[in-house]
Structure formats: structure tokens, C-alpha cells
Amino acid sequence: KCDLLLKGGHVIDPVNGIDEPMDVAVSGIKIAAVAEDIPSNSAARVANVSGCYVTPGLIDLHAHSWGSVAAMFPDEMCLPYGVTTMLDVGGAGWRNFDDFRKARIVPAVTRVFALLNIVGAGMAGDDAEQNVSDMVAGATAEKILERRDILVGIKTAHFRGPGWENVDRALEAAER
């Protein structure tokens, strides 16, 4: 017997080539079955999702959950919209990543990956992102190597120049 049966939803599952009304049985955190007309008595709970789309978790590849006034807690901005995995794009830098991880990543149900801002302060405001002396390639590379389970790249943005110092520092960090 499954824990939950999603009954009558329109399943869209590109990996398995499904784009039609189907039922979805869930046991624990696993999909137990996807089929037409799964009997309701095979589930502890039944949710009528007729008129709704049912799809594997979506991925948000550009989100802000740290370092800006628009930043939101991952679960608040993701889960209500079917997003189960997100990429924070540079809210934290090498100096404040550990705080970001403790405050936002660890408590979240949403799976969070991040780009580490080349600026140690992260997206702490426009002036902070102009601080070339806070763009430390070595510290950025060390933090990425320390947390490769979460950190998947380097963010550089909002730099007014002159020149390409922010990009040069990010490339230096990436090459380490």
C-alpha cells in the first residue's frame, strides 16, 4: 500500500515520455508507480489533482536566497511553484558563505546549489561589488574546494570597471 496517491492529474515526464492524464503513487519519498487508474484503496491518502499538472521537481537556475534585499528563503520561493532544486547565483562570497550555508541551505527542504561570488562579501550592495581588493582568487578557490557538494561555479557581476579585473580574478580562482 502506498502512502499517497495523486489521482487524475496530467503527468508531464519528459524522461519517460509521458504527457497525459495518469495517477502517481508515492511511497515515502519515492515514486512507486505511474499508471492509469491506480485503485484508490491502494493508498493511505488520496489527493484528487484533476485539472493540475504533475511533474518531476523543477530546477530554478537563477535565484537569490542570500545577499540582496530581494533574497528569499529557498523553500518560500521554490516549493510552492514545484521547484525542488535551485541555484543561488552569487549571493555569498568566500567570507560569508558559511553563514549563508547555515542560515539558508542547511534548514531548507529545497536542494540548493550555489555560485560563489568572486567578491568576498558577495552581493552586499553595489559598492561592495566594486571592491577589487575583496576579489581574492585564492580564498574563492579554497572555499569552492571545501564545499564542492554545494558550490558549482564562480559568479562575477555588477562590476563597473574599468577593465576586466573581476573576470580576471574569477578565472584565476577557476584555474586553481
Indicate where each model-derived feature is located:
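Histidine-rich, glycine-flanked metal-binding segment
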Residues: K1-L5, H10-T55
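Fold-independent oxyanion-binding glycine-rich loops
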Residues: G8-G9, P14-V15, V34-A35, V49-S50, ...
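Short glycine/serine/threonine-rich phosphate/pyrophosphate-binding segments
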Residues: G67-A71, R95-N96, W164-N166
